[in-house]
UniProtKB/Swiss-Prot annotation:
Organism listed in the record: Emericella nidulans (strain FGSC A4 / ATCC 38163 / CBS 112.46 / NRRL 194 / M139)
GO biological process, any: secondary metabolite biosynthetic process
UniProt entry tagged with the keyword NADP: yes
Gene inactivation effect: Impairs the production of monodictyphenone, but still enables the synthesis of intermediates until emodin.
InterPro entries named in the record: NAD(P)-bd_dom_sf (IPR036291), Sc_DH/Rdtase_CS (IPR020904), SDR_fam (IPR002347)
Entries under SMART domains matching the protein: PKS_KR
Binding annotation for NADP(+): 25, 98, 131, 162, 166, 197
Gene that this polypeptide is encoded by: mdpC
Name of protein: Short chain dehydrogenase mdpC
Keywords: NADP, Oxidoreductase
Length: 265
């Protein structure tokens, strides 16, 4: 391949940072970006061993990666991890904000502490990840935030705090896309539906009526019926869409939220 040849969807020469990528959807995103040729910064808060294992998997794909610890609830740590990423790889082209927490609770029972716990990571942290991404990214960069199909399209009882924390992301994306135009940076979000990760079995019972009466295997089978495609969603399904949004082919996709739930919502 000559220097002037463009390979569609490939990310050679790009540097990507994925927050909360020690496991689950974030890990799949980091691995996919590495598979597409990007150098990857694997950010983690507590999952050091899985993050370091993921770095090795990415390196085995023929690219480079590094694991950097940061609690992105703290803005100073967001700044530090992006500074360190730029110092290590010489630049930054793609920032994916994945870190988040789930929450269930009836409106009448939600505490101030629970509200703040959820919004501090799902909403506030994502805002400042985007701010620092804008400040650190090269021109023609990509910011990809994380919403949820429950933000607007899929209503779930006892889920108002989580849904609201993700709904704010959809407003952020539309306005941030305008703000980032001066650097030719696109801003988009993915909005997954139910996805089978290591957290799936802890939360699936809340999405399915009388879910607490069913086994983990039964819950997964029941969740598969929500999509007209009659299968579960997996982290790689989300990662493939992120890979597209990160690519040159997505340069005309901007300020958009892409729901990735197999048609469930």
């Amino acid at each position: 391949m000559t220097a002037t040849t463009h390979a569609p969807y490939r990310l050679e020469g790009k540097v990507a940072l994925v927050t909360g990528s020690g496991r689950g959807i974030g890990a799949a995103m980091a691995l996919e970006l590495g598979r597409l040729g990007a150098k990857v910064v694997v950010n983690y808060a507590n999952s050091r061993e899985p993050a370091e294992k993921l770095v090795q998997e990415i390196k085995e794909l023929g690219t480079d990666a590094i694991a950097l610890q940061a609690n992105i609830r703290n803005v100073s740590e967001i700044v530090r991890v992006m500074d360190d990423a730029v110092a290590h790889f010489g630049g930054l082209d793609i920032v994916c904000s994945n870190a988040g927490v789930v929450s269930f609770g009836h409106l009448g029972e939600v505490t101030e502490e629970e509200f703040d716990r959820v919004f501090s990571l799902n909403t506030r942290a994502q805002f400042f990840v985007a701010r620092e991404a804008y400040r650190h990214l090269n021109t023609h960069g990509r910011i990809i935030l994380m919403s949820s199909n429950t933000a607007k399209e899929f209503s779930v009882p006892r889920h108002s705090v989580y849904s609201g924390s993700k709904g704010a992301i959809e407003s952020f994306v539309r306005v941030m896309a305008k703000d980032c135009g001066d650097k030719q940076i696109t801003v988009n979000a993915v909005a997954p539906g139910g996805t089978v990760t290591d957290m799936f079995y802890d939360v699936a019972q809340h999405y399915i009526p009388n879910g607490e009466k069913h086994s983990a295997e039964e819950l997964q089978k029941m969740a598969a019926t929500v999509s007209p495609l009659k299968r579960n969603g997996f982290p790689v399904d989300i990662a493939k869409v992120v890979g597209f949004l990160a690519s040159r082919e997505a340069e005309w996709v901007n300020g958009k939220i892409i729901t990735v739930d197999g048609g469930a919502a």
